[in-house]
């Protein structure tokens, strides 16, 4: 699958942009090591897998969008490192909210210490973020206030994205119609989150490249497509925890009473969402098609003409990473 990543970039610049991705990720790790240096917790050097293209798909997409917007190389690398900080913040918060652990920082903490590892990921990512921003401002002769503004802008973007999560704590009182889930919940939760990589460039790229607006629109659609797929995977969990879920809303408001009844019965019986979709293949096919069309529209708008043949493979890769769902 790495060939998909390599092919995102023009052939003459493939190795250069791959190197930029690696340089940005390695810069994040260097700064994280400096933050933890001589402390009680030690950073473990990242594995090749954690720095691989296949583990950093969205980072590669965002880097591609910066390249397409003709942002200079030095700042592209800088933004890759910034985005890794945002990734650490978002993943750490998601881990705590979902009671799981997806690694963003390798340390010598016990593997089972999921909650504290997530807390540490958040603290280190936030510290590295401000370190990167303040160092950049110093190098460019900009006042420290600019770094503070950029840091606050990141917080604002992530807080706007996370607000729907807060509204779900304690459980939702009603299941919104599917269109309302997209406009009132997923718009913020995922659509705007996928635009967050442009928050810092919006301050440092003046004037903003004309291609930036299209890149943000395409990222938004990619994000919504991802969220629909994610909702397919998390259908039973979200129903059990009384969370908003686009798929649940489609079934509750747009399908037969039998389908909704079957869903209500199935989610607490040890069945998987896959079992439910197997019993209702039409629902699964329509939802997967909608998600894939959203992904393909976003990727198609992002990719340059020579790379349009990669839209389908890239969308399929995303779908497989989210839940192993076979695109329909």
Where are these regions (language model features)?
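Conserved N-terminal diphosphate/IPP-binding helix and adjacent helical/loop segment
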Residues: 1-108, 163-179, 315-328
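All-alpha helical catalytic cores of prenyl diphosphate-utilizing isoprenoid enzymes
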Residues: 20-37, 49-61, 119-229, 236-239
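A ubiquitous short alpha-helical element
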Residues: 43-50, 111-118, 181-186, 278-286
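Acidic, Mg2+-coordinating active-site segments of isoprenoid diphosphate-utilizing enzymes
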Residues: 64, 91-113, 125, 167, ...
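Helix-rich alpha-solenoid scaffolding regions
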Residues: 81, 88, 115-124
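A structural signal for well-ordered alpha-helices, especially hydrophobic packing surfaces
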Residues: 90-93, 133, 197, 226-229, ...
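Primarily interfacial, aromatic-capped hydrophobic alpha-helices that serve as membrane anchors
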Residues: 123-146, 254-305
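Short hairpin/turn module used for nucleic-acid contact or packing/dimerization
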Residues: 288-328
